């Protein structure tokens, strides 16, 4: 019952979208999208009921399937270690609802590639930016939500005695190689020194010392971190968000706008949440929308753990 916007009513040159772009006609995923759209509209569980009864509809790599946890894990490892993925990073991606699940999947995949005891970063690591970092001339070094491959890496101790890695990243969007910047080795004891300096500079700024915030951000933006951490300030606990992370898995929210050939979905993480009272279902409206976004990222196929 909305009124038609004049923008669409009187404009001469306009485009009407009538064709499916991501998935080819006949892809079984299209039927799932239809079920989910109805579920979103009516707050129902038709999609979940359907896939429980029809656990697989895939042929020639097109469609969907639900597989057990052990098989799901091995499938992820196989896909990310395949020649196909190395030639095309949009071949495969994992998505989940919570940051914890994303972190867990990233660890499983990366450990299978470089081993559990490897440094926090490694040549050819796939990383995803969680922040836009600019240089002193306000030119972006890395862009939020962009994929990068670790092109070059050199161990480096900063003037403050912080163990870091001096790295160059290659953008998977345009092939641009970034200027060198520093990633803090969060496994090293000197990470505590980094946090101490950051806390000190934050407190100076909070106390309104002249140019305090400028100094704080100048220091902070010299270093990138790959995990979220807290510092204890005069204003209480402050959480510092990570700048980058491994890019094999990402939250459903982070995938919006992206398309991958094949997507692995931790459906259990979307449908349920763990509480102190046990496992409970997430809000039906939220989970239906999340499931729709997650499934619709795939061009060819989806595998689900549920």
Which stretches of residues belong to each language-model region?
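Conserved helicase motor core of P-loop NTPases
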Residues: 1-144, 149-204
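C-terminal accessory regions
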Residues: 163-306
